[in-house]
Amino acid sequence: ATAQAPAERRAALEARGITVLTCGDGPQVDLTLAMRQLGEREIGSILLEGGGKLSGAMLERRLLDKLVLMFAPKIIGGGQAAPMNITFEGFAKMDEAITLDRLKVEQFGPDVCLTGYPVFKS
C-alpha cells in the first residue's frame, strides 16, 4: 500500500491479522522500497502475479532474479490494449536487451511455461 491507501481498507486488513506495509507516498507502490522492506523482514522470495505493466516495472528496476512466464496459445490481437506478459519502455539497441539464462521450457496441456534467470547488461 501507499500512504494514500484508504485508511478503512488498511484497518480491515489489519483486523484480519494481515501486515500492511507502506511503500511510498504517491499513488503507486514504490517497488524498490517494497522489496527492501520485505528483505528486512527476511522474506527472500515472492510470487508476483499481475499484468505486464507490473512485471515490466519489476524487471526494469532489476528487482526480479527469476521469471516464470506462462503462455496460452491464444491470439487475440487488439494492439496496445492486448494483454502482454511484460510491458516497459524497452531498450534502444538489441545488445542491451535482457536475456534469460538457464532456460527451461515445459508444456502443461496447451499452455507453455518458460522459466529463466534474467541477465542484465551493464
Predicted regions and their residues:
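Enzymes that bind and transform nitrogen-containing heteroaromatic metabolites
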Residues: 1-122
